[in-house]
Amino acid sequence: MQKSKDIGFKISNMDLHIDPFDDFYNYACGTWIKRSKIPKDSPIISSFYELRDNTYEKLKLILLSCIKEPSKFKNGKLLADFYQSYIDMKTRNRLNFSPIKYIIEMIDALKDKDELPKLIAFLMLNAVNTFIRFDPSPDEKNSSVYALHIHQGGLSLPEKSYYIEDLLKKVRLSFRENIIKMFRLYGFSIAEAQRAADTVIRIETKIAMISRSKGELRDVLKNYNKMSTDKFRKRFAYLHLDELLNDIVPKLPDYLIVGQPEFLSGLGKIIEEENIDDIKLYLKWHVLRSTANLLHEKAANTLFLFFGRQLTGQKKMKPMWYRATNFIINTIGNALSELYVEKYFDKSAKAKAVKLVNNIRKAFRERLSRVSWMSQSTKDKALEKFDAMGVKIGYPAEFKDYSSIKSSKNDLFGNYIKAYQFELKRVMGRISKKVDKKEWPTEAFTVNAYYNASMNEIVLPAGIFQPPFFDPNLDDAINYGGIGSIIGHELTHGFDDQGSKYDKYGNVREWWATNDREKFNEKAKDVEKLYSSLEVLPGIRVNGKLTLGENIADLGGHTYCL
């Protein structure tokens, strides 16, 4: 092969000494793999992570401009206040744990378990999620309306396997040490902190035992249980639904969607078994865990020792500016999105992106129409769904109005709670209302893309339209290999093991002929088996059931862009 100069995707990352027919992976990126090292402040290195870090640099420049001339930019003062309050470690250290004193006092005031639902609601209003998780999102079987979903929660570790598998025993021991350190920082004696840690782990292990695994949570049908509000009140009386939701939602909905009913039943038994003082310790831990990164330096560093270093392998924390930027992304990110689009997104490139999307859609449709194992009736419905699939590119037509948030450059925790409650009020206020099809659930600078099943659409934010994934000045072949494979990946999600359960309107219903669904499941099982056979580390294999949707999308994405 004739050697070429580096272009957008950097040929120097390839290993041209390898025959692509023997080892395409190393041919494509072998040299990059050999010379790349995971940064000490990152758990991973990849094109996505490198581009994300570059994007954060751009966001930092925007924020520094807001600090210098806040009146020059929309939401300039708000962004400047949030950034400055985060990096002001002198004030944070002086305040110590005082910003969360009012939350801890509310926990200490708990006298009876019947008061627990109201306390859970108070904690949620103050950005502390505990036993259960609320999600106001489109009803999976009536995607035109927002419904209130209730899901399992209550765990500090990523999922239930961390509490029960022998392989992860060392992780649990480190987790216990981290809880002890955090309670010691808060002022507990060694004995008190040890008892608190043992209590937290005991309660969370009980919760893990009644929780579904990540693999089980992927199945949309098994995690959809529509229940009238009256039935919920009777079945889960211990939650005192009215007290639980009165301060969170403007009006109780007629029905709820309960993701895991057996979890709520089991949780009631756990709460009944545990004494009130131990429940208080559990709740205090979740306050400390949820707020440590917004408090003093020692609290943030202590949390990182386990949740950063131990769980992810990240050796050191990101620099302060990076963490401050991330804080803004997670609170008032839409304000930053608007300025990012103005400064960095080449709107003229959007036309080329649309053309590229249309060409990949054409290839996808042609291939779908030729599927030999699918009956014509199912194929016709699949094509209808594909033709109805929407595409959002770049950024939303409108951005959020943050004018009601009164910020201060000296009050990090106050800024956080105001932003959190602003968003909570916004999303909870839409329950039972019509879904806003124009809404973007991600920020414009996000270096990613996704398929939204309930909207039957793919979303391609402005942030993904950067080298090495996309460059409007380069040959189309390079862009098809970059952003093209990502677009194909997201289109395929509409027909993977879960996406295929949604119809063209974004509603979960069985639109496949029975025989076709059985054939699809057989083929999906083959993909699951293939990936489950891959050994990542000695004795550790890929969980093909958990990764199935992504594996199907990867295979489809590369096929269609080629």
What spans do the regions from the language model cover?
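Short amphipathic alpha-helical segments with coiled-coil-like heptad repeat character
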Residues: 27-41, 180-192, 388-390, 468, ...
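Short secondary-structure subsegments characteristic of cysteine-rich extracellular domains
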Residues: 41-63, 191-207, 479-485
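Short, well-ordered loop/turn elements at secondary-structure boundaries
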Residues: 19-21, 126-129, 141-144, 273, ...
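Short, surface-exposed beta-strand/loop micro-motifs that present aromatic residues
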Residues: 15, 135-138, 447-451
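Noncatalytic, helix-rich "gating/capping" subdomain that lines the substrate-entry/channel surface
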Residues: 63-355, 359
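Intrinsically disordered, low-complexity linker/terminal regions across diverse proteins
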Residues: 1-2, 200, 206, 230, ...
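A charge-rich, low-complexity, intrinsically flexible signal that marks solvent-exposed coils, linkers
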Residues: 11-12, 16-20
